Amino acid sequence: GLPMHWAQWIDGAIALPIMLLTPLIGQHAAEIVMALVWPLGLLAIFMMLMVRVSGEIGARDGMRREAQWAGAILGALAFPAVEKFGPGSFDHHNIELICGMLAILGLMRMRAHPRSGLWAGAALGLALATAAEGIPLMAAGLMAAGMLWLLRPADYAKGLGWLGAGIAASLTILFAALVAPSEWMRPVCDSMGAPFLGVGLVGGGVAIALVCLPAALTLTIARRVGSASALGILGIALLGLLFPACAGGSYSV
């Protein structure tokens, strides 16, 4: 019940199985089970995403299977990442890693399947709603999708729009679910609150706006750069005006 710098939906996801298992095996045994099942289950998801991303890379050269094996081996040896999934790892870092990998997979598939941008955006929204580490993830995802649109607008415009919609929609839903109405206007800068929602709505809104611009403003790469820069600057300025207390950093409030 205390304010935390990461979303307490993780606590609920861990506590619920413990509560259900306690009448069957006792609380101590239930906690031990979850100390193993939770992080190792997340590790399985992370490894699956690593394999899928690697397969997407290898498929470009007709080497999907070989790349998948390489991804599995590299993922297993990536100690700075996989140590976040060790038994008893009850925090948010493993969730952030999974959200990041899911967003990467969605971005990679966006050209062939534009709606992949929707669940890539939802993953970025969940990452931001979970903890402040989601801010650089969201920035990187938007920049990557924006660069793809700048260089190949015909291939990536729809995907960029879906990405923006996924970010804005997921953060709106998560804000309503995770933040009490009495806290909606409180400028919390290090966890889910109005500023994080603002970041998502502005970032997602800019992505959607870019693909809705008149053709005259997106005809050449120079015009696309100018349009994206103008909208980005306006978005950042709007956030600064709405949440000046957060300008000093995550722990300003």
What are these regions (language model features)?
Residues 38-60, 64-150, 163-182:
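Membrane-embedded helix bundles of polyisoprenyl
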Residues 8-15, 36, 40, 49:
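Extracytoplasmic/secreted proteins, especially bacterial periplasmic and envelope-associated proteins
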Residues 1-27, 127:
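Short hydrophobic/aromatic helix or loop-helix immediately within or flanking a transmembrane segment
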Residues 1, 30-35:
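Short linear capping/connector segments at secondary-structure termini
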Residues 96, 118, 123-253:
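Transmembrane catalytic cores of multi-pass membrane glycosyltransferases
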Residues 27-32, 74:
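Transmembrane helical cores of multi-pass ion-transport proteins
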